[in-house]
Protein backbone atom coordinates (compact mmCIF):
# COMPACT_ATOMS: atom_id res chain seq x y z
CA UNK A 1 0.00 0.00 0.00
CA UNK A 2 1.41 3.35 -1.05
CA UNK A 3 -0.41 5.44 1.55
CA UNK A 4 -2.55 5.23 4.63
CA UNK A 5 -5.81 6.32 3.00
CA UNK A 6 -5.56 3.51 0.49
CA UNK A 7 -4.98 0.96 3.24
CA UNK A 8 -7.83 2.40 5.30
CA UNK A 9 -10.17 2.02 2.34
CA UNK A 10 -9.19 -1.61 1.90
CA UNK A 11 -9.73 -2.25 5.62
CA UNK A 12 -13.22 -0.73 5.50
CA UNK A 13 -14.08 -2.80 2.44
CA UNK A 14 -12.85 -5.98 4.15
CA UNK A 15 -14.71 -5.13 7.38
CA UNK A 16 -17.97 -4.71 5.48
CA UNK A 17 -17.55 -8.03 3.69
CA UNK A 18 -16.68 -9.81 6.95
CA UNK A 19 -19.78 -8.41 8.67
CA UNK A 20 -22.02 -9.44 5.79
CA UNK A 21 -20.60 -12.95 5.55
CA UNK A 22 -20.49 -13.29 9.35
CA UNK A 23 -24.22 -12.58 9.57
CA UNK A 24 -24.97 -15.08 6.82
CA UNK A 25 -22.80 -17.73 8.49
CA UNK A 26 -24.36 -17.18 11.92
CA UNK A 27 -27.83 -17.41 10.38
CA UNK A 28 -26.98 -20.65 8.58
CA UNK A 29 -25.80 -22.26 11.83
CA UNK A 30 -28.83 -21.16 13.85
CA UNK A 31 -30.57 -24.33 15.15
CA UNK A 32 -33.66 -25.42 13.25
CA UNK A 33 -35.53 -26.29 16.46
CA UNK A 34 -35.97 -22.57 17.14
CA UNK A 35 -36.21 -20.94 13.71
CA UNK A 36 -34.54 -17.59 13.07
CA UNK A 37 -36.33 -15.38 10.54
CA UNK A 38 -35.25 -12.11 8.99
CA UNK A 39 -38.76 -10.74 9.55
CA UNK A 40 -39.19 -11.43 13.25
CA UNK A 41 -35.61 -11.60 14.52
CA UNK A 42 -33.25 -8.66 14.84
CA UNK A 43 -29.73 -9.20 13.56
CA UNK A 44 -28.33 -9.10 17.10
CA UNK A 45 -30.57 -12.02 18.10
CA UNK A 46 -27.83 -14.12 16.53
CA UNK A 47 -25.67 -13.18 19.53
CA UNK A 48 -28.43 -13.30 22.13
CA UNK A 49 -32.07 -12.23 22.32
CA UNK A 50 -33.19 -9.50 24.67
CA UNK A 51 -34.41 -10.28 28.20
CA UNK A 52 -36.52 -11.59 29.74
CA UNK A 53 -35.91 -15.20 28.78
CA UNK A 54 -32.89 -14.44 26.61
CA UNK A 55 -31.98 -17.14 24.12
CA UNK A 56 -28.37 -17.88 23.17
CA UNK A 57 -27.75 -20.42 20.43
CA UNK A 58 -24.30 -21.78 19.62
CA UNK A 59 -22.28 -21.65 17.47
CA UNK A 60 -24.25 -18.72 16.01
CA UNK A 61 -23.66 -16.52 19.06
CA UNK A 62 -19.89 -16.97 19.02
CA UNK A 63 -19.75 -16.42 15.26
CA UNK A 64 -21.77 -13.21 15.42
CA UNK A 65 -20.14 -11.70 18.51
CA UNK A 66 -16.62 -12.50 17.32
CA UNK A 67 -17.41 -11.02 13.91
CA UNK A 68 -18.61 -7.77 15.49
CA UNK A 69 -15.60 -7.38 17.77
CA UNK A 70 -13.11 -8.19 15.00
CA UNK A 71 -14.67 -5.88 12.43
CA UNK A 72 -15.11 -3.09 14.96
CA UNK A 73 -11.38 -3.20 15.63
CA UNK A 74 -10.69 -3.16 11.89
CA UNK A 75 -12.93 -0.09 11.48
CA UNK A 76 -11.10 1.68 14.30
CA UNK A 77 -7.75 0.88 12.69
CA UNK A 78 -9.02 2.31 9.39
CA UNK A 79 -10.22 5.42 11.23
CA UNK A 80 -6.80 5.90 12.80
CA UNK A 81 -5.08 5.64 9.42
CA UNK A 82 -7.51 8.12 7.86
CA UNK A 83 -6.94 10.59 10.68
CA UNK A 84 -3.19 10.37 10.17
CA UNK A 85 -3.55 10.84 6.42
CA UNK A 86 -6.23 13.48 5.93
CA UNK A 87 -7.69 14.56 9.29
CA UNK A 88 -11.11 14.74 7.62
CA UNK A 89 -13.31 14.94 10.71
CA UNK A 90 -16.48 14.60 8.62
CA UNK A 91 -15.34 11.04 7.98
CA UNK A 92 -13.18 10.04 10.92
CA UNK A 93 -15.49 11.12 13.75
CA UNK A 94 -18.61 9.20 12.65
CA UNK A 95 -16.48 6.31 11.44
CA UNK A 96 -14.67 6.08 14.77
CA UNK A 97 -17.95 6.19 16.69
CA UNK A 98 -19.31 3.53 14.32
CA UNK A 99 -16.33 1.31 15.11
CA UNK A 100 -16.88 1.73 18.85
CA UNK A 101 -20.54 0.83 18.38
CA UNK A 102 -19.70 -2.33 16.44
CA UNK A 103 -17.20 -3.48 19.09
CA UNK A 104 -19.74 -2.73 21.82
CA UNK A 105 -22.45 -4.78 20.13
CA UNK A 106 -20.07 -7.75 20.06
CA UNK A 107 -18.87 -7.36 23.65
CA UNK A 108 -22.38 -6.77 25.02
CA UNK A 109 -24.82 -9.19 23.29
CA UNK A 110 -28.56 -8.61 23.33
CA UNK A 111 -29.03 -10.21 26.75
CA UNK A 112 -26.87 -7.53 28.41
CA UNK A 113 -29.06 -4.50 28.98
CA UNK A 114 -29.01 -1.58 28.56
CA UNK A 115 -25.52 -1.66 27.05
CA UNK A 116 -26.34 -3.61 23.92
CA UNK A 117 -29.14 -1.25 22.93
CA UNK A 118 -26.95 1.77 23.66
CA UNK A 119 -24.11 0.55 21.46
CA UNK A 120 -26.51 -0.53 18.70
CA UNK A 121 -28.06 2.95 18.68
CA UNK A 122 -24.59 4.52 18.58
CA UNK A 123 -23.65 2.25 15.68
CA UNK A 124 -26.75 2.99 13.62
CA UNK A 125 -26.76 6.73 14.29
CA UNK A 126 -23.07 7.21 13.54
CA UNK A 127 -23.28 5.06 10.42
CA UNK A 128 -26.24 6.97 9.01
CA UNK A 129 -24.68 10.35 9.76
CA UNK A 130 -21.34 9.23 8.31
CA UNK A 131 -23.01 8.16 5.07
CA UNK A 132 -24.79 11.51 4.75
CA UNK A 133 -21.67 13.55 5.55
CA UNK A 134 -19.63 11.61 3.00
CA UNK A 135 -21.71 13.40 0.36
CA UNK A 136 -19.54 16.45 1.08
CA UNK A 137 -16.19 14.96 0.08
CA UNK A 138 -16.99 12.27 -2.49
CA UNK A 139 -17.64 12.80 -6.17
CA UNK A 140 -20.82 12.67 -8.21
CA UNK A 141 -22.65 10.32 -8.71
CA UNK A 142 -21.49 8.02 -5.89
CA UNK A 143 -21.98 10.84 -3.37
CA UNK A 144 -25.71 10.75 -4.11
CA UNK A 145 -25.78 7.01 -3.45
CA UNK A 146 -24.06 7.53 -0.09
CA UNK A 147 -26.50 10.32 0.77
CA UNK A 148 -29.53 8.16 -0.02
CA UNK A 149 -28.14 5.22 1.99
CA UNK A 150 -27.64 7.46 5.01
CA UNK A 151 -31.12 8.97 4.76
CA UNK A 152 -32.71 5.52 4.47
CA UNK A 153 -30.80 4.24 7.50
CA UNK A 154 -31.73 7.17 9.74
CA UNK A 155 -35.33 7.30 8.52
CA UNK A 156 -35.94 3.65 9.37
CA UNK A 157 -34.06 4.07 12.66
CA UNK A 158 -36.14 6.96 13.97
CA UNK A 159 -39.47 5.99 12.39
CA UNK A 160 -39.19 2.22 12.83
CA UNK A 161 -42.62 1.92 14.45
CA UNK A 162 -44.21 2.86 11.13
CA UNK A 163 -42.64 -0.11 9.35
CA UNK A 164 -42.63 -2.90 11.93
CA UNK A 165 -46.27 -3.91 11.15
CA UNK A 166 -45.27 -4.46 7.51
CA UNK A 167 -41.64 -5.62 7.68
CA UNK A 168 -41.44 -7.03 11.19
CA UNK A 169 -38.77 -6.05 13.72
CA UNK A 170 -36.06 -7.87 11.82
CA UNK A 171 -36.97 -6.55 8.41
CA UNK A 172 -37.20 -2.99 9.67
CA UNK A 173 -33.83 -3.19 11.43
CA UNK A 174 -32.20 -4.48 8.26
CA UNK A 175 -33.32 -1.31 6.46
CA UNK A 176 -31.18 0.49 9.02
CA UNK A 177 -28.20 -1.85 9.18
CA UNK A 178 -27.71 -2.88 5.56
CA UNK A 179 -27.60 0.64 4.05
CA UNK A 180 -24.84 1.44 6.56
CA UNK A 181 -23.04 -1.77 5.65
CA UNK A 182 -23.33 -0.99 1.93
CA UNK A 183 -22.01 2.53 2.57
CA UNK A 184 -19.03 1.17 4.48
CA UNK A 185 -18.15 -1.17 1.62
CA UNK A 186 -18.72 1.63 -0.88
CA UNK A 187 -16.68 4.29 0.91
CA UNK A 188 -13.91 1.76 1.41
CA UNK A 189 -13.83 1.04 -2.31
CA UNK A 190 -13.96 4.76 -3.08
CA UNK A 191 -11.04 5.61 -0.80
CA UNK A 192 -8.90 2.80 -2.16
CA UNK A 193 -9.86 3.32 -5.81
CA UNK A 194 -9.39 7.08 -5.99
CA UNK A 195 -5.92 6.89 -4.48
CA UNK A 196 -4.88 4.16 -6.90
CA UNK A 197 -6.10 6.27 -9.80
CA UNK A 198 -4.09 9.29 -8.66
CA UNK A 199 -0.98 7.21 -8.15
CA UNK A 200 -1.21 5.85 -11.69
CA UNK A 201 -1.46 9.29 -13.32
Segments (PLM) and residue ranges:
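Membrane-interface helix-boundary motifs at transmembrane edges
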Residues: 2-5, 77-91, 135-144, 194-200
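N-terminal signal-anchor transmembrane alpha helix
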Residues: 3-33
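Hydrophobic alpha-helical transmembrane segments of polytopic
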Residues: 8-19, 64-67, 71, 91-98, ...
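Interfacial/capping segments of alpha-helical transmembrane domains
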Residues: 28-44
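Interfacial helix-start motif at the membrane-water boundary
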Residues: 46-73
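Membrane-proximal helix-loop-helix units in multi-pass membrane proteins
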Residues: 95-135
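Terminal transmembrane helical module of multi-pass membrane proteins
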Residues: 135-201
Amino acid sequence: MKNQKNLAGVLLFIAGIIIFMGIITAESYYPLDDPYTTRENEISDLGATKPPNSIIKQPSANIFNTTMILTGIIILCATFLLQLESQNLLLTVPLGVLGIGVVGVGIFPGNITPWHSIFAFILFTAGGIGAILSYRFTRFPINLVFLVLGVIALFFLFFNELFIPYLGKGGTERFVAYPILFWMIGIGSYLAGTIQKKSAS
